[in-house]
Curated annotation (Swiss-Prot):
Record GO terms (molecular function): G protein-coupled receptor binding
Organism: Camelus dromedarius
Subcellular location: Secreted
Gene Ontology CC entries for this record: extracellular space; secretory granule
Name of the protein this chain belongs to: Beta-endorphin
Similarity field: Belongs to the POMC family.
UniProt keyword Secreted, yes or no: yes
Function text: Beta-endorphin and Met-enkephalin are endogenous opiates.
Listed SMART domains: Op_neuropeptide (SM01365)
Gene Ontology annotations of biological process type: neuropeptide signaling pathway; regulation of corticosterone secretion
Primary gene name: POMC
Amino acid sequence: YGGFMTSEKSQTPLVTLFKNAIIKNAHKKGQ
């Protein structure tokens, strides 16, 4: 269980960056 928590913590920033990239891409398409 401890390993799962560690992997989840390291995975969260990647998900945030991925979402930010999608939002930026959507803004570029909007313009």
